[in-house]
């Protein structure tokens, strides 16, 4: 199997960052710059996405989780802090289910425990249908705009454009299938790790009920809400986001 792209910067206790749908390693650039000053930051690009666009994509959240755990095994990383954004939040929940004792602290960012994502701006199946009807170019410009309050006028929107340059329709559809078929709600009670949940109150991908479900069911969790932010809080309120995460993991 072709190796995926993994950026690995800084020294210290590892922080693993897992991007979401149509994301990339580069989309964590502001976090890499900040956190690499005091910890080792590992940011894979998921198979088929971003810098790993030439790798064969997966249609299973569990397989994505296993792939990242495999990367960490190769790097001989035993314990780590773990953050996942959106679909990446599903992946980190699955990683914690498989290897929870290795996760020091968990950060579930703009995510939920139900892959179908109740309350999303459209159903996963609708996105799949539009993807097939409209193709990648239209879909890849339509969906990421919804992740920012300012849409494609946000200063960091270019990261979304970069991320999708070489992503195929099959990869995009496989990830939608993976999300649609995944659920982690029954496992939330088994997550004992200290957990930070982050959400922007204008997020149209995940509504409050989704993050509240995480908060109510994960025993050692706390929820932090960013006002007037959408789905990409880490790109909309970079400094506040980074400080919040730093205070949590240190």
Please provide the spans of the model-predicted regions.
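Flexible "cap/lid" loop of the alpha/beta hydrolase fold
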Residues: 93-98, 103-133
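Gly/Ala-rich beta-loop-alpha elbow adjacent to hydrolase catalytic centers
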Residues: 84-88, 92
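Acidic catalytic loop of the alpha/beta-hydrolase fold
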Residues: 202-206
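Conserved HGGG/HGGXW glycine-rich cap/lid loop of the alpha/beta-hydrolase fold
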Residues: 5-54
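Active-site loop/oxyanion-hole signature of alpha/beta-hydrolase fold enzymes
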Residues: 32-33, 42-83, 98, 243
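Short beta-strand/loop motif that positions the catalytic acidic residue
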Residues: 191, 197-199
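Conserved alpha/beta-hydrolase catalytic His-Asp/Glu region
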Residues: 116-122, 133-189
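Catalytic histidine-centered segment of alpha/beta-hydrolase-like enzymes
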Residues: 229-238, 242
């Amino acid at each position: 199997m072709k190796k995926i792209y993994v950026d690995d910067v800084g020294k210290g206790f590892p922080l693993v960052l897992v991007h979401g749908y149509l994301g990339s390693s580069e989309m964590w650039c502001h976090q890499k710059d900040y956190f690499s000053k005091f910890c080792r930051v590992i940011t894979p690009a998921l198979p088929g996405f971003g810098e790993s666009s030439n790798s064969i994509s997966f249609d299973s959240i569990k397989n994505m989780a296993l792939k990242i755990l495999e990367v960490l095994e190769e790097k001989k990383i035993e314990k780590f802090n773990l953050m996942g954004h959106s679909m990446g939040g599903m992946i980190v929940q699955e990683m914690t289910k498989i290897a929870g004792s290795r996760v020091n602290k968990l950060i579930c960012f703009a995510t939920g425990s139900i892959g179908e994502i109740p309350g999303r701006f459209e159903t996963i199946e609708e996105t799949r249908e539009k993807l097939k009807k409209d193709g990648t170019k239209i879909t890849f410009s339509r969906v990421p705009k919804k992740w920012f309050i300012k849409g494609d006028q946000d200063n960091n929107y270019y990261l979304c454009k970069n991320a999708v340059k070489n992503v195929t329709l099959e990869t995009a559809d496989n990830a939608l299938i993976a999300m649609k078929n995944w659920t982690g709600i029954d496992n939330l009670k088994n997550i004992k790790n200290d957990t930070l949940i982050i959400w922007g109150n204008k997020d149209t991908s995940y509504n409050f009920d989704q993050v509240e479900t995480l908060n109510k069911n994960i025993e050692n969790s706390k929820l932090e809400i960013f006002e007037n932010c959408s789905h990409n809080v880490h790109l909309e309120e970079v400094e506040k986001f980074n400080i919040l995460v730093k205070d949590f993991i240190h």
